[in-house]
């Protein structure tokens, strides 16, 4: 029996309205805060740190059941798709934490 699940979402974001790193960082900060507050997720910017119109975020959740992790990631993806930036390539993965 599994003791828990880790859900990971990787999302490429494009900020067509950002004209500087400062503007991009405002978008990224907002996205990270909202993902943490709404979904209880851990969030990190993992790529494109010095590119002012792109970012790659990795979002992680830990739950007791696979369905809950999958639902949280789907909700997080929908949230990212509904914002003022463009959502690019997205990947999702669920990993079980075995009792062994």
Name every feature range the model reports, one short phrase each:
Residues 19, 25, 47-50, 91, ...:
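Solvent-exposed, flexible loop/coil residues
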Residues 39, 55, 86:
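Residue-level signal for beta-strand positions within conserved beta-sheet cores that form or flank
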Residues 9-13, 57-59, 90-94:
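A structural signal for short, well-ordered beta-strand segments
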Residues 63-100:
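C-terminal structural segments of small proteins and small subunits
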Residues 1-6, 50-54:
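Short coil/turn motifs at beta-sheet boundaries
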Residues 2-42, 79:
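N-terminal first-folded block
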Residues 42-46, 86-89:
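Short, flexible active-site-proximal loops enriched in glycine and acidic residues
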Residues 43-64:
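Short, charge-patterned binding micro-sites
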